[in-house]
Amino acid sequence: MLQTMKTLTLIPTRLGSTRLPNKPLADICGKPMIVHVADRAAAAKLGRTVIATDSEEIFKVVAAHGHEAIMTRGDHESGSDRIYEALAKLDPSGEIDAVVNVQGDLPTIDPDTIRRALLPLEDGPADIATLGVEITVEEEKTNPNVVKIVGSPLAGNRRLRALYFTRATAPYGEGPLYHHIGLYAYRRSALERFVKLGPSPLEKREKLEQLRALEAGMRIDVEIVKTVPLGVDTQADLDRARTFCSQAGTI
């Protein structure tokens, strides 16, 4: 159960964005974006919150704002590899049971949304847990940048057992479609197994890392939430985050 699980929250981040250079350090209402993310992750109160980065500049900025950071290698191909290195350094004795992986470009994410990502690990046998939201905008159903979840309903309509993730419009026929939110919670054993697997055929075809776990027989359960947090990938996204902040008075 969740009460007995020791949890660590990790935020992998780097400066190497091509679409939005120096994205983690972009100013939003007087604070770097990565600091907003760290503030919200810490507010979720899922154990220790640590930023994992290969950038000394990010490390110093995060520390200056009172958050913990750890340096990782610069040659990681994915955030999963980066958080595994951080976990091994932070907890070499293996006391941590579950790791929450929060993307460093979600400055408006609700702390409760982060907390909900752990629920499938608390309630059931999932190896990995993640989040989804029902698609209500018609254009998103055919947008390949909106990743869809194909899954079997669990616990009414608030959770799915993931069978597949795809950029196509799926599943076919009447019924809701679900947008995948790329925030994960891993059992430690699942993360250790996942990073040792090579890229899978469907992962390479769809360009979706989570398919590696499904192809290896790992179970992913999806907690359904009400809203999609704003991910910042472009200048337009950053402008929206700044507008949200100025209108709300804070993120």
Curated annotation (Swiss-Prot):
Gene Ontology BP term (one): CMP-keto-3-deoxy-D-manno-octulosonic acid biosynthetic process
GO cellular component, one term: cytosol
Subcellular location(s) per record: Cytoplasm
Pathway listed: Nucleotide-sugar biosynthesis; CMP-3-deoxy-D-manno-octulosonate biosynthesis; CMP-3-deoxy-D-manno-octulosonate from 3-deoxy-D-manno-octulosonate and CTP: step 1/1; Bacterial outer membrane biogenesis; lipopolysaccharide biosynthesis
Catalytic activity: 3-deoxy-alpha-D-manno-oct-2-ulosonate + CTP = CMP-3-deoxy-beta-D-manno-octulosonate + diphosphate
GO molecular function annotation: 3-deoxy-manno-octulosonate cytidylyltransferase activity
Top EC group: transferase
Gene3D superfamilies: Spore Coat Polysaccharide Biosynthesis Protein SpsA, Chain A
Membrane-spanning ranges: none
Keyword annotations from UniProtKB, A to Z: Cytoplasm, Lipopolysaccharide biosynthesis, Nucleotidyltransferase, Transferase
EC number: 2.7.7.38
Keyword Cytoplasm: yes
Cross-referenced SUPFAM superfamilies: Nucleotide-diphospho-sugar transferases (SSF53448)
Keyword Transferase: yes
Assigned protein family: Belongs to the KdsB family.
Purpose of the protein: Activates KDO (a required 8-carbon sugar) for incorporation into bacterial lipopolysaccharide in Gram-negative bacteria.
Protein's name according to its UniProt entry: 3-deoxy-manno-octulosonate cytidylyltransferase
Organism of provenance: Brucella canis (strain ATCC 23365 / NCTC 10854 / RM-666)
Lineage, highest ranks first: Bacteria, Pseudomonadati, Pseudomonadota, Alphaproteobacteria, Hyphomicrobiales
Gene: kdsB
